[in-house]
Amino acid sequence: MISIILVMIGGGFGAIARSAITDYFNHKFTSKLPIATLIVNLVGSFLIGLTIGLSISISWFPAFFVTGFLGGLTTFSTLAKELTLMMTPKFNINLFLNYSLLQFIIGFIACYIGYHI
């Protein structure tokens, strides 16, 4: 039961962090790519890799930080929404593919680097 509470609390903080980061980047930068989602997913992927690589032995930490906070910070559903919204009558296949590749390939690379630090 305690792990569910830790995931819930961590997830809440992660979602708040994602919202703040998204608001900041959406007001600060203009881009054809949804840069805020890219940033939170890459940072989250790196931190997940780093946390797993460090093999932190604090019993509550994975539930709170990895599943909770980083699960709330990163967002696959927003990525799916953004990719769907790119499919308009002015659909740009290059933008769509580049954004998809940035998210998935660089996200994996960020996780891999974090794991091996």
Swiss-Prot record:
Keywords: Cell membrane, Ion channel, Ion transport, Membrane, Metal-binding, Sodium, Transmembrane, Transmembrane helix, Transport. The keyword Transmembrane helix applies. One of its GO terms (cellular component) is plasma membrane. One of its GO terms (molecular function) is fluoride channel activity. The keyword Transmembrane applies. Na(+) is not transported, but it plays an essential structural role and its presence is essential for fluoride channel function. Pfam families: CRCB (PF02537). Fluoride-specific ion channel. Important for reducing fluoride concentration in the cell, thus reducing its toxicity. Na(+) binds at G71, T74. GO terms for biological process: cellular detoxification of fluoride; fluoride transmembrane transport. It is a multi-pass membrane protein. It comes from Staphylococcus aureus (strain NCTC 8325 / PS 47). InterPro entries: FluC (IPR003691). The chain crosses the membrane at residues 1-21, 46-66, 95-115. This is Fluoride-specific ion channel FluC 2. Belongs to the fluoride channel Fluc/FEX (TC 1.A.43) family. PANTHER family: FLUORIDE EXPORT PROTEIN 1-RELATED (PTHR28259), FLUORIDE-SPECIFIC ION CHANNEL FLUC 2 (PTHR28259:SF16). It catalyses: fluoride(in) = fluoride(out). Its main location: membrane. It is found in: Cell membrane.
